[in-house]
């Protein structure tokens, strides 16, 4: 037999309204609260969370929408967000979009229907461009990827500057023909491309960039295609960790050596990058700090809904390893 709130009230010797106030942290004396909590424990009653949401008009849940949790960047980000939510006695619901705008729209609609408290979100470029015109009952903080200037709170790194650091380092090592491979779904990749292009122009070098699916297989296939066509650049740069993995797989598959035959650099200081060969040169992003800062900004937005939108930019760090060594004579 199911236990109802009336059963709890009867055992505690209070009214159902008092039990409800205990569940919603309403004004109840300590003595009555203890009686209700004891009755809940004795009966094994579990509050109806959906009903509580209807009464309070919001949940105690944070939505986290990312492209793919298998991307180590988002794995680390998710843990930081969940830890911050736990400390605030809140839950996190995780959604993977697979870079699909239709799937994004479905999850955003779900968040609205579930009266979510707020959302941490890494949107595709297509959705980010229209976010400012959308009307939500909850605040959104973007991570890693930006929307239209000033339309949303955002936390990330200076992507253009970080890409420029990689180019400057490669040029200092004597590399001139530097290929840049960038994802085709996010504003982050566009910003990194722009930083790459600006740095190449600053050094008087021609750009050679490609936009493709932000995945390991796509990056590997693109490198193999270029090598089959007789194009072997001095160096190749990937705009995210999954693409960097694909590039390294392609280099190994082609029987090439880094950095003797080709230099390889990219983004995200994942654990495997220091274990392969002489190690891969990367931009390290403060991912956990990004997650914590996003949650801090979301809580601030909840406390002060009318505050001006903020853009929090953290610094990426160049980690130099053997894969970007001096170009062979």
At which residue positions do the language-model features occur?
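Short, well-structured alpha-helical segments in soluble
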Residues: 102-115, 219-231
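Short beta->alpha connector loops
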Residues: 98-101, 122-127, 242
């Amino acid at each position: 037999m199911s236990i109802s709130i009336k059963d709890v009230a009867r055992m505690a010797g209070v009214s159902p309204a008092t039990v409800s106030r205990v569940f919603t942290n309403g004004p109840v004396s300590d003595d009555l609260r203890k009686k209700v909590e004891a009755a809940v424990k004795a009966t094994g009653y579990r509050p109806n969370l959906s009903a509580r949401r209807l009464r309070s008009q919001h949940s105690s849940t944070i939505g986290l929408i990312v492209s793919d949790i298998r991307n180590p960047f988002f794995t680390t980000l998710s843990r930081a967000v969940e830890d911050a939510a736990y400390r605030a006695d809140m839950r996190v619901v995780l959604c993977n979009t697979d870079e699909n705008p239709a799937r994004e729209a479905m999850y955003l609609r779900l968040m609205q229907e579930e009266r979510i408290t707020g959302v941490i979100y890494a949107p595709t470029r297509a959705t980010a461009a229209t976010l400012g015109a959308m009307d939500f009952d909850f605040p959104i903080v973007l991570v890693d990827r930006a929307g239209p200037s000033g339309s949303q709170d955002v936390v990330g790194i200076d992507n253009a500057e970080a890409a420029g650091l990689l180019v400057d380092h490669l040029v200092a090592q004597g590399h001139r023909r530097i290929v840049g491979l960038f994802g085709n779904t996010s504003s982050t990749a566009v910003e990194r491309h722009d930083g790459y292009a600006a740095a190449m122009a600053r050094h008087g070098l021609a750009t050679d960039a490609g936009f493709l699916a932000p995945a390991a297989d796509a990056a590997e296939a693109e490198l193999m295609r270029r090598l089959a066509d007789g194009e072997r650049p001095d160096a190749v740069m990937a705009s995210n960790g999954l693409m960097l993995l694909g590039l390294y797989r392609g280099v190994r598959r082609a029987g090439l050596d880094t950095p003797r035959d080709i230099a390889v650099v990219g983004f995200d200081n994942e654990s495997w990058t220091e274990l392969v060969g002489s190690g891969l040169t990367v931009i390290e992003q403060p991912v956990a700090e990004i997650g914590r800062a996003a949650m801090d900004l979301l809580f601030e937005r909840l406390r002060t809904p009318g505050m001006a939108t903020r853009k929090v930019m953290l610094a990426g760090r160049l980690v130099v390893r053997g894969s970007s060594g001096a170009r062979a004579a």
